Amino acid sequence: MIQVLLVIICLAVFPYQGSSIILESGNVNDYEIVYPKKVTVLPTGAMNSAHPCCDPVTCKPKRGEHCISGPCCRNCKFLNAGTICKRGRGDSLHDYCTGVTPDCPRNPNKGESDELEWSAAATGSVLM
């Protein structure tokens, strides 16, 4: 209800900037932003007006905040470069945050063998 009221106020005050409409899509925490000829689905809870990182009107991180969610985002800020965001298994290398994105990029030093899944056959080993 609050989001609908905010959209109505924004459309009345800024009629040419109101190119998006916020819709509630069945689940309380799932929202979509509808642009002309384009629908963007947001992360669960991103449009919750209580979300500390998100401006409920623009659906972007608040001023001074870097991100809303992601493995390299905590408390609305990017994690420091070098922070482990995905631990390697066995001899596999870890993946690290870059400090400039909320995503966890694949470690460029990983070889082809690091891509094997744990479900692959284990020769001479017992997995428990």
From Swiss-Prot:
It is found in: Secreted. Keywords: Cell adhesion impairing toxin, Disulfide bond, Secreted, Signal, Toxin. GO terms for molecular function: toxin activity. SUPFAM superfamilies: Blood coagulation inhibitor (disintegrin). Residues 47-112 form the Disintegrin domain. It comes from the Eukaryota. Expressed by the venom gland. Heterodimer with bitisgabonin (bitisgabonin-1 is the name of the heterodimer); disulfide-linked. This is Disintegrin gabonin-1. It comes from Bitis gabonica.
